[in-house]
From Swiss-Prot:
It is a multi-pass membrane protein. It comes from the Bacteria. GO terms for cellular component: plasma membrane. This is Protein AaeX.
C-alpha cells in the first residue's frame, strides 16, 4: 500500500499508483533510448516482449522505492 495521497488534477482523482506509473514510463523511455544504440535489440527475439518486461521491471523498482 502506498503512502502517497490521492492526487486531484482539474477535478479528476488519480490513485497514488498513477505517479509511480508515470515515473516508470519516463525511466523506460530513457533506458530504451540508451539501449537502442548499443545494438542489444539485435540479440532480442521479440522486441515488444522485451520492452514489456523492461517496463515491468522498472515499475517494480519504482514501486519498491515509494513503499
Amino acid at each position: 500500500m502506498s503512502l502517497l495521497p490521492v492526487m486531484v488534477i482539474f477535478g479528476l482523482s488519480f490513485p497514488p499508483i498513477f505517479l509511480e506509473l508515470l515515473i516508470s514510463l519516463a525511466l523506460f523511455f530513457v533506458v530504451r533510448r540508451i539501449l537502442q544504440p548499443t545494438g542489444i535489440y539485435e540479440f532480442v527475439w521479440h522486441p515488444a516482449l522485451f520492452n514489456t518486461a523492461l517496463y515491468c521491471c522498472l515499475f517494480y523498482l519504482t514501486s519498491r522505492l515509494f513503499s
